[in-house]
């Protein structure tokens, strides 16, 4: 498959997976990536483009038992499914009870913290380490353990459901697991993963990775977002933050510091503030907003809580050997107060094995000082 066919058949699904080629390899008049508007007539006509692919769906629905879900008991790790072949995941959707009152089971326990203690893992091509090892809430946009419906280009929470549309290529296989680390709640998951099988994939094409970080911070320590080695690019992140004191938002003073390849001692890219990186300003003075490539689903100043996301396409941060991304507050330590955070960084790398830091304990995952109850009457 040549580069022009790649743009026609795959770019509109998110060309974020394509690792960079040299300028000389680029067809004349064609741009790499996808800025949200067509780069060529082929991009504009993508919905009408006929492609030789086999569409399938991995689902928790069991036709023989007429059961829609797979149970995930507390303390258990369950394989949702494994697929052999070559292709890419085009859409990932799931939902599960436990974080809201269940009208069909009114005495069932409810705890929004299960959005932190239910862990999603994805393995590519027989790799030993998962490329994705992230709490479900953090991965889809509900890392504050509050669910506020929003839809970005690649992920979101939609009125009780959780979806992801990052293109996720695989050459031989993929496997999806869920682990329930909650001390009290059993749950069951509804899941549909639509994937396309193909005899050929465009090259060079990276494997999708999601790195999770979390900590309680006394104030001046850097907020680590991502660190990876090899060739690839950084494609964006979700970041959730909360001050220990109410009305404290000065953690937003920390600009991004991005270290790339030979620029390891001093950052290659430095910003002007944390909210500036997410393309807002003045501590997001107008409150929450939603866009395809950046947004703030939650800003609760009284609770000192902010949920933010940004997606990179044509502005992806490329690297050949390594990358490190952190937010670093320039204020003197005496001006800073404690806060906590959790984050998910999205990358495409030239290897399928995960490189993220090991997941902390369930107790450490529950980093928030306060969880706001967002449950409400919900009877169809």
Residue ranges and their predicted role:
Residues 31-380:
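Beta-strand-centric surfaces of beta-sandwich/beta-rich domains
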């Amino acid at each position: 498959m040549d580069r022009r066919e790649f743009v026609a058949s795959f770019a509109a699904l998110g060309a974020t997976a394509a690792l960079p080629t040299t300028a000389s390899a680029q067809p004349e008049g064609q741009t790499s990536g996808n800025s949200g508007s067509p780069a060529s007539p082929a991009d504009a006509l993508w919905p009408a483009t006929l492609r030789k692919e086999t569409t399938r769906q991995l689902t928790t629905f069991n036709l023989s038992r007429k059961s829609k879900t797979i149970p995930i008991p507390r303390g258990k790790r369950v394989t949702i499914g494994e697929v052999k072949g070559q292709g890419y995941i085009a859409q990932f959707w799931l939902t599960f009870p436990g974080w809201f009152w269940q009208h069909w089971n009114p005495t069932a326990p409810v705890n929004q913290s299960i959005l932190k203690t239910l862990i999603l893992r994805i393995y590519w091509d027989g790799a030993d380490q998962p490329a994705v090892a992230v709490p479900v809430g953090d991965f889809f946009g509900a890392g504050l353990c509050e669910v506020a419906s929003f839809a970005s280009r690649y992920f979101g929470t939609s009125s009780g459901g959780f979806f992801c549309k990052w293109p996720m290529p695989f050459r031989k296989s993929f496997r999806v697991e869920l682990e329930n680390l909650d001390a009290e709640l059993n749950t069951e998951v509804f899941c549909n993963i639509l994937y396309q099988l193909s005899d050929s994939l465009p090259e060079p094409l990276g494997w999708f990775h999601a790195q999770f970080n979390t900590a309680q911070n006394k104030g001046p320590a850097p907020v680590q977002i991502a660190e990876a080695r090899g060739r690839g690019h950084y494609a964006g992140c979700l970041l959730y933050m909360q001050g220990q004191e109410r009305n404290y938002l000065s953690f937003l003073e920390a600009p991004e510091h991005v270290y790339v390849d030979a620029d390891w001692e001093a950052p290659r890219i430095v910003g002007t503030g944390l909210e500036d990186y997410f393309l807002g300003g003045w501590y997001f003075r107008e409150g929450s907003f939603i866009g395809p490539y950046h947004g703030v689903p939650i800003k609760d100043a009284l609770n000192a809580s902010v949920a933010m996301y940004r997606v990179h396409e044509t502005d992806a941060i490329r690297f050949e050997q390594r990358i490190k991304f952190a937010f670093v507050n320039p204020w003197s330590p005496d001006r800073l107060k404690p806060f906590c955070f959790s984050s998910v960084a999205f990358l495409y790398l030239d290897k399928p094995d995960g490189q993220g830091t090991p997941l902390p304990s369930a107790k450490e995952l529950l980093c928030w000082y306060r969880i706001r109850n967002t449950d409400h009457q919900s009877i169809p």
